[in-house]
């Protein structure tokens, strides 16, 4: 049985910045292992983000996305042969707005919660989001090149960081909202004696996790500037 998953990755960038024609027309198509055939030009993926593997990949990606300077702190231990939760997410740069928007969108997509109660991811995410809200009750974003909150000089390093944070925050917010408004397009092709039966169920938790990973990858790859 062939399972084709097609994602349009250009639509959500249109809200943030103009793209080249080739980028606008780009689509993401993958054929997963176990299918009957692998058409030329399609990416072969060894792992579909499942209930446990997908969460692990998401956590690892979030760690890499939020760690400045090579993530040296992620190897620190708390003395009990476990990685200290406080060492996982050093919230600097645009990591704070990314996590803030991610939490809001996840709550909107799945009211019952994306992470299982017995999963360490949920506890870590809750603790870090509470920590982020205490450290950054409000981001001093810039509007039309002027600080909304008092700063010594608009050209100071602090203003530069705030400007990058706010730009990235706006891009992530629009991107995630676009994905919520336009759900993942999933098509399962089942062949029974030469008869193709098409089904288009709603996105599952694993598919939503994968979609968010793609969004965060694009954001971290492009940095505070738009791709294209």
Curated annotation (Swiss-Prot):
Q: Does the record carry Endoplasmic reticulum as a key word?
A: yes
Keyword flag Isomerase:
no
Q: In which tissues is it expressed?
A: Pancreas. Found in alpha, beta and delta cells in the pancreatic islets.
Q: Which UniProt keywords apply?
A: Cytoplasmic vesicle, Endoplasmic reticulum, Golgi apparatus
| GO terms for cellular component | cytoplasmic vesicle; endoplasmic reticulum; Golgi apparatus
Per the record, the domain of life is Eukaryota
Where, per UniProt, does this protein localize? Endoplasmic reticulum; Golgi apparatus; Cytoplasmic vesicle, Secretory vesicle lumen
- Function as written in the Swiss-Prot or TrEMBL entry: May play an important regulatory role in corticotrophs.
Family per similarity comment: Belongs to the RESP18 family.
Q: What is this protein called?
A: Regulated endocrine-specific protein 18
Report the source organism.
Homo sapiens (Human)
